[in-house]
Amino acid sequence: MPSPLKISIIIPSYNQGKYLPETIKSIIAQDYSNYELIIIDGGSTDDTLNVIRHFHSHITYWVSEPDRGQSHAIHKGLAQATGDIINWINSDDLVAPGAFEHIVAVFDLHKYDVVCGYCHYFINDIAHLDLRNERMGLQPTVGETMLHRQINQPSTYFKASVFRALGVNERFHFTMDLDLWYRYLLQAGQSRVLLTDFLLSYFRLHESSKTMTSSPLFEAEAAQVFYNVLYSLSQPQELLAFMQRSIPEAKFVPTRYSVKVPTHELRPLARAYAWEALIFYNQTKNRSAARVCLRIARQNNWPLGVRFLRQWLKHYALPSRLLP
């Protein structure tokens, strides 16, 4: 009889002593015992160390020392993990009751790389649930799934070997989960992702959480991820230049992701951004760049409807002196 699957749960932590006890309690209250709890603290100066010491008998490994941020902490935790299934949860979020038992019941490692369930959002206290109850959605193609920008990371568990092969990109401090998810999709597609209707986590919103205080930084990093995807698809410079407008970081260096899924899976993403770029270049009167983006949209199956024909006439049939 095979051994029961082991879950590794990593908590990256920094000055969240106020919320950490509840996070730890949500894990040790699970009705499945074959798990390990790894806490990587970035040298907290609040009550975090006292909390960790209080729960030390339930913690497999912990360390408190300065690090380079959340992504680095997850990377350090991954080096300590020995489980078959791995996820991280922030030090202010909660694992839902029964989550571990459900995950091992449905996670067939021969069939799946990823299992994702629902995530409830709540404001400050678990008694104050937000209206959102979300699960990562899979669309008909990888490109359409990417356009939805939804992962619900606390409720997304990876097969350990897959997580290790992908790793966590330390360049991202806010969207490391989006980067991880998109790199996975580009390599493996969606066929080995299992969506379950089970509630796996609670995501806390509060006045000092990154989600509440750093929205512009989230968007800037998300723009880098999307740029990397299109860069990896070898899209023309005109489209990449449009994408780079949303990236404020002057030192941004693009990363080429490994792409193994068929081209047709990614056409919805390319044509959607090509059309956005077309509108932008029309507004800025850059006709040559607009033409390039119009071709990209059509090459990626933008439908031959009224919207496309208007743009085609504008750029290929009417003389430029007649255009505004």
Short names for language-model regions:
Residues L5-S8, E36, D179:
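Cell-envelope/extracellular polymer assembly enzymes that use nucleotide-activated donors
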